[in-house]
C-alpha cells in the first residue's frame, strides 16, 4: 500500500474504507475500529426530533471481484456473499436488488490481494457496504447527545393509547451541530440500521501519475526479473517499493518444450538506472516499470541524423546498427567482432585469440574461391579424442606447392595417374629398403649418364 498525494489522516481514512474498518472523530477522540461500548440515545419523534424521513434504495450488489497475482500467474476471484442482517428493511432492499440486477458485474479488487482467503474477506466487506447503503435515516432534532458513532433508538407515540412504538435502532454516521447567537441549538443526522457491521463509506482513491525512479536492487529473490526502485519523493525518507515487474516489448513462455521461460526480450534494468514508473488502474499500490531513461550524465544520442542504433551491456558487449554505412557490428570490449556490410556483402569475423566452429557436419561453399591464410595450417588430427579418419582433397586441378619443401608421409602411400604420371624435378632421389618397378609392356629409362648398381 502507498500513501500518495494525501495527508496521513486521508490515507488512514481511505484504508479504513477499503478494508471496512471504523475510523471517526467523536468530538473528543479519534477512534479506529468499532467501539466496544456505544452509548444508546432514545429519540422521540415530536419531542427531540422535529423531522424525520426514511430512504430505501436498491442497487447492483451482485458482483464478481477479481485480482491478478503475477508471482504465480493466477487470477483470484470471489462473488459477493449474502449478508446476515437482523434488519428487515435491509433484507427487503437486498432481495429486491438481487431480483432486479440478476447479472453480476465484474470489477477489480480495490486493494491488493495475496491469497484466496483475503479475496473472500474483501468480497464480504464489499457486500457489507452494499447492504448498509440500502437503508438511510435522516432526522433533525435538538438532543445534544447525538454524536458520531452512537446508537439512537427512534420512538413514535402510539396513536390509540399512551406509550411509544419502537422504530428501530440506528448507528449515527453523520451529524452536524448548529448553535445560534441567541443560544438555540439543533442538529441534523444521518444513520443506518445498527445491525450493519460495516459503514458504507467510500473514500476517493488518489490517481497515480507516471513517476521517475532509480533502481536500487535487481537481485529478485524469486528470480522473476523484478526490481526495487526508489521514486524521487521517497529519497529523503529512504523508502523503496516492493519487488515490481518490468515492462518489455515481448515477454512470454514457450508453447512447447523448447522454451518454457524467458521467451522474448529480457532486459532487466541495472542498479542505478533511471526508470519511468506506471501504475495499473492508476493505483499507487500497483506500480510497474515502463522503461529506462537516459539523462545528461550518460546520454550520447544516435549520432548525426540519428544514424546509429545500438544495444550495449554493462560488460561492453555491443550490437551496433549503422545506417550510414549500412552495417551491423557485434563487438565485445576486447575487440572481438562480427561485422556485416550490406553494401559490399562482406561478413568479417575477428578475434584477438581464437575462433572455434563445432558441429556434426560443416560445409563451406564459395561460388568463386576460398582462401585460407595462416603461418601454420593443420587439417585433421592423428590422435587425441577425435582422430581424423579420412581426408579427401578433390578437384579438376589440385596443386600442392611448398616454397622450400613439401612432404607426404604415410604407412602406405599411393600416387596414381590414370592416364599419365610424371615426376619432375631438378634432382630426384628415392631411398627404400626394397623397390620393385613393374611396367606392363614397356619400361624406358634414358639419361646422358645412367648408373644402376
Predicted regions and their residues:
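Amphipathic alpha-helical and helix-coil boundary elements used as assembly
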Residues: 1-453
Amino acid at each position: 500500500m502507498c500513501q500518495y498525494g494525501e495527508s496521513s489522516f486521508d490515507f488512514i481514512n481511505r484504508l479504513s474504507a477499503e478494508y471496512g474498518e471504523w475510523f471517526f472523530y467523536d468530538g473528543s477522540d479519534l477512534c479506529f475500529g468499532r467501539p466496544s461500548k456505544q452509548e444508546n440515545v432514545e429519540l422521540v419523534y415530536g419531542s427531540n426530533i422535529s423531522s424525520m424521513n426514511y430512504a430505501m434504495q436498491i442497487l447492483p450488489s451482485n458482483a464478481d471481484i477479481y485480482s491478478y497475482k503475477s508471482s504465480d500467474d493466477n487470477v483470484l476471484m470471489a462473488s459477493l456473499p449474502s449478508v446476515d442482517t437482523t434488519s428487515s428493511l435491509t433484507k427487503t432492499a437486498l432481495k429486491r436488488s438481487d431480483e432486479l440486477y440478476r447479472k453480476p458485474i465484474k470489477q477489480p479488487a480495490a486493494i491488493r490481494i495475496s491469497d484466496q482467503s483475503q479475496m473472500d474477506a474483501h468480497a464480504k466487506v464489499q457486500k457489507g457496504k452494499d447492504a448498509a447503503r440500502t437503508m438511510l435515516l435522516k432526522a433533525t432534532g435538538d438532543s445534544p447527545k447525538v454524536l458520531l458513532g452512537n446508537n439512537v433508538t427512534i420512538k413514535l407515540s402510539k396513536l390509540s393509547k399512551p406509550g411509544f412504538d419502537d422504530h428501530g435502532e440506528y448507528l449515527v454516521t453523520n451529524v452536524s451541530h448548529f448553535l445560534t447567537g441567541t443560544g438555540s441549538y439543533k442538529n441534523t443526522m444521518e444513520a443506518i440500521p445498527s445491525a450493519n457491521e460495516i459503514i458504507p463509506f467510500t473514500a476517493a482513491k488518489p490517481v497515480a501519475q507516471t513517476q521517475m525512479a532509480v533502481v536500487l536492487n535487481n537481485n529478485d529473490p524469486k528470480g522473476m526479473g523484478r526490481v526495487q526502485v526508489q521514486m524521487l519523493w521517497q529519497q529523503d525518507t529512504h523508502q523503496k517499493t516492493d519487488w515490481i515487474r518490468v515492462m518489455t516489448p515481448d515477454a512470454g513462455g514457450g508453447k512447447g518444450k523448447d522454451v518454457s521461460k524467458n521467451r522474448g526480450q529480457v532486459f532487466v534494468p541495472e542498479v542505478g538506472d533511471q526508470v519511468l514508473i506506471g501504475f495499473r488502474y492508476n493505483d499507487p499500490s500497483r506500480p510497474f516499470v515502463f522503461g529506462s531513461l537516459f539523462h545528461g550524465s550518460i546520454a550520447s544520442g544516435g549520432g548525426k541524423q540519428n544514424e546509429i542504433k545500438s544495444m550495449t551491456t554493462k560488460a561492453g558487449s555491443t550490437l551496433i546498427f549503422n545506417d550510414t554505412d549500412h552495417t551491423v557490428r557485434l563487438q565485445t570490449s576486447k575487440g572481438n567482432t562480427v561485422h556485416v556490410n550490406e553494401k559490399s556483402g562482406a561478413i568479417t569475423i575477428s578475434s584477438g585469440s581464437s575462433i572455434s566452429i563445432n558441429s556434426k557436419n560443416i560445409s563451406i561453399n564459395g561460388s568463386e574461391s576460398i582462401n585460407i591464410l595462416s603461418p601454420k595450417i593443420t587439417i585433421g588430427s592423428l590422435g587425441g579424442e577425435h582422430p581424423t579418419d579420412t581426408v579427401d582433397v578433390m578437384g579438376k586441378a589440385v596443386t600442392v606447392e611448398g616454397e622450400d619443401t613439401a612432404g607426404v608421409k604415410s604407412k602406405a602411400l599411393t600416387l596414381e595417374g590414370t592416364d599419365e604420371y610424371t615426376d619432375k624435378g631438378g634432382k630426384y632421389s628415392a631411398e627404400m629398403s626394397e623397390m620393385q618397378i613393374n611396367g606392363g609392356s614397356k619400361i624406358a629409362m634414358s639419361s646422358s649418364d645412367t648408373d644402376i648398381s
